[in-house]
């Protein structure tokens, strides 16, 4: 991946990107393949995945119009580019709204490291540095295609972001099979669906592929001999690299279909490992596929294939279990059918029809817009002509009839004819009657108004008289009240001072004041005594309350001390038990380690034929019918009559 960077920038990359230079292309592809598997598993379980620095894989719900006023609600996967990356490089992406009930999990490097031979730091460094290199490639205005294995291809061309998903992935996520058809039939989303064959196509040299995958195994693999039928003669031919890639692609399509069926048969929560296709590709001997195809790719029904006899099947060695003679002949007579070319032709035809439909639709829309503009233009012309005609008519009318006065003054008005004299007399009588009735009505209204004024004056006079009478009455009552009060004061007036007698020994004032002082002093003494008793009781109660509080505090301190001692004892007991459990676990682990060491030593000293798979080499069986490889068609079931050797009986 770093082969396109200049030498000056490579030294800087070794400081900024310490992980990528130490990894090969195959290792980088393997790491991103594991990342794609993790994202695919999470999307299969209807969960979003956020890749820091790149974007988020999630779902969106959309109502698609299927025609004939029918709508279908689909949930399709989408990729939302990171906002920081979009703002930094000025990228353009369709705005997509994702519902909030779909959980989004971050990229878990620990789970990815458990699935491959790389540790967590290596995977995280590879992902981060690859995204840094991707950001630099975008910054220099270079076209980029980022391939996610099993998911789709993220392409950035002319600062436009587009994510195209594989049909197999959409089918596995949807489960109903309607999502792919709905997206492929709509003009807005038809370019979001990508077939698996298009992903293997040759990319333009101007686009930078992430992560780069070099097919070294395909280039270094020797040509495979394929036996086919050509002109009725049996002869082997060597397939070229292009034919071999087509066959591998056909096998890929069949395997992907099997993967789709297997994935639909299980629930999303149980998918915890890689797909069946990845397991099939990682297997050493199972990855080689022998295909028997005719040179022309077609077979006639009346022609029988002619194959060269082989003593044993050399391409199906699985744990020593070869194919028997019968299964081998059946396998050689069968030929594989690949629908890759037909599927590609069908897709090309569908794309052509879709383009024709789009062109026809655009032409129809353009024709409708032209017709609408022409109709609008004609209507505007009609309105302008009508307005012009109205203006001309108004102008001509004004010119024909100029303004004139509506009334005239005649100096000598001629007399009215005698025919209208009777009507004029009636009109004059009616006018006189109206004038008389109007005059009577005014007189009556004036009389009523005067009467109402007089009534108001009389009523006001009565109210004033009543108020004055009430005022006089209240004044008389107040005078009587003051008079009674003065009479009571005069009546209750105290006695006069005693007469002064000179040289009198008896006191004149304060003769009866001693008894009152004695009573007052007694009251004060009793009050003071009561107050002293209350103060003493209050002081005694305060002292008792203080003693009770001190005793309660002392009891609380003693209880707290006992609880603290009990907690310390329990903590010491817990620590002792924990130490004892740890010591027991250590002893148990030590014993298990010793046992494992003994088992490993015994295994190393054991013979090579210890496992059942090693012993299966002695007993070769056909992998299809489970019979011995020397089977030539005989049956294990005895017939109704069988001749026994050395006997005259027929059983």
From Swiss-Prot:
Start-end of Basic and acidic residues biased regions: 212-222, 232-250
InterPro entries per record: CCDC81_HU_dom_2, Coiled-coil_dom_cont_p_81, HU-CCDC81, IHF-like_DNA-bd_dom_sf
Region Disordered, annotated ranges: 194-314
Tree of life domain: Eukaryota
Record GO cellular component, one term: ciliary basal body
Keywords attached to this entry: Coiled coil, Cytoplasm, Cytoskeleton, Phosphoprotein
Ranges annotated as biased composition (Polar residues): 265-275
Molecular function, one GO term: DNA binding
Positions bearing Phosphoserine: 206, 273, 275, 294, 416
Coiled coil regions, renumbered to chain: 428-465, 539-566
Compartments it resides in: Cytoplasm, Cytoskeleton, Microtubule organizing center, Centrosome
Protein's name according to its UniProt entry: Coiled-coil domain-containing protein 81
Species of origin: Rattus norvegicus (Rat)
């Amino acid at each position: 991946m770093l082969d396109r960077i200049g030498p000056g920038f490579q030294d800087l990359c070794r400081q900024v990107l310490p992980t990528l230079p130490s990894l090969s292309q195959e290792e980088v592809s393997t790491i991103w393949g594991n990342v794609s598997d993790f994202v695919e598993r999470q999307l299969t379980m209807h969960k979003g995945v956020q890749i820091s620095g790149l974007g988020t894989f999630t779902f969106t719900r959309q109502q698609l119009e299927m025609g004939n006023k029918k709508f279908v609600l689909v949930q399709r996967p989408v990729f939302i580019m990171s906002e920081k990356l979009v703002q930094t490089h000025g990228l353009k992406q369709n705005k997509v709204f994702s519902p909030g009930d779909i959980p989004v999990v971050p990229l878990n490097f620990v789970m990815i490291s458990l699935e491959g031979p790389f540790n967590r730091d290596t995977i995280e460094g590879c992902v981060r540095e690859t995204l840094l290199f991707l950001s630099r490639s975008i910054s220099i205005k270079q076209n980029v295609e980022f391939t996610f294995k099993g998911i789709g291809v993220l392409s950035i061309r002319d600062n436009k972001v587009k994510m195209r998903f594989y049909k197999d992935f959409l089918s596995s996520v949807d489960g109903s099979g309607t999502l792919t058809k709905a997206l492929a039939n709509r003009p807005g989303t038809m370019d979001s669906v990508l077939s698996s064959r298009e992903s293997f196509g040759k990319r333009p040299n101007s686009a930078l592929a992430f992560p780069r995958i070099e097919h070294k195994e395909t280039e270094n693999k020797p040509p495979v001999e394929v036996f086919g039928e050509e002109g009725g003669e049996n002869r082997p031919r060597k397939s070229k690299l292009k034919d071999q890639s087509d066959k591998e692609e056909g096998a890929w399509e069949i395997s992907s279909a099997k993967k789709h069926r297997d994935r639909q048969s299980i629930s999303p929560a149980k998918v915890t490992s890689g797909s069946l296709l990845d397991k099939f590709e990682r297997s050493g001997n199972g990855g080689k596929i022998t295909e028997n195809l005719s040179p022309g790719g077609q077979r006639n029904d009346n022609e029988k294939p002619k194959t060269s006899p082989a003593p044993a099947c050399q391409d199906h060695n699985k744990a020593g279990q070869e194919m028997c003679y019968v299964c081998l002949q059946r396998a050689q007579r069968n030929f594989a059918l690949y629908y890759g070319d037909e599927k590609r032709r069908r897709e090309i035809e569908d794309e052509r029809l879709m383009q024709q439909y789009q062109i026809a639709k655009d032409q129809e829309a353009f024709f409708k817009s032209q017709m609408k503009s022409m109709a609008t233009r004609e209507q505007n012309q009609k309105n302008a002509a009508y307005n012009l005609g109205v203006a001309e008519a108004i102008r001509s009318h004004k010119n024909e009839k100029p303004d004139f006065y509506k009334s005239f003054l005649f100096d000598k008005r001629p007399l009215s004819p005698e025919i209208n004299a009777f009507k004029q007399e009636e009109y004059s009588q009616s006018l006189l009657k109206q004038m008389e009735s109007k005059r009577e009505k005014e007189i009556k209204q004036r009389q009523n108004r005067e009467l109402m004024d007089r009534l108001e004056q009389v009523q006001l006079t009565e109210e004033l008289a009543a108020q004055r009478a009430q005022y006089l009455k209240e004044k008389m009552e107040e005078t009587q009240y003051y008079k009674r009060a003065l009479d009571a004061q005069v009546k209750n007036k105290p006695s006069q001072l005693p007469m002064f007698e000179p040289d009198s020994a008896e006191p004149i004032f304060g003769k009866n004041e001693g008894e009152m002082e004695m009573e007052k002093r007694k009251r004060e003494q009793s009050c003071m005594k009561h107050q002293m008793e209350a103060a003493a009781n209050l002081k005694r109660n305060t002292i008792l309350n203080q003693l009770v509080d001190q005793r309660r505090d002392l009891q609380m301190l003693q209880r707290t001390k006992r609880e603290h001692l009990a907690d310390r004892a329990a903590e010491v007991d817990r620590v002792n038990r924990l130490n004892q459990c740890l010591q027991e676990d250590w002893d148990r682990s030590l014993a298990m380690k010793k046992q494992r060491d003994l088992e490993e030593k015994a295994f190393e000293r054991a013979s090579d034929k210890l496992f059942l798979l090693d012993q299966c080499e002695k007993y070769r069986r056909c992998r299809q019918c489970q019979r011995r490889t020397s089977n030539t068609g005989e049956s294990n079931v005895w017939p109704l009559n069988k001749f026994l050797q050395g006997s005259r009986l027929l059983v």
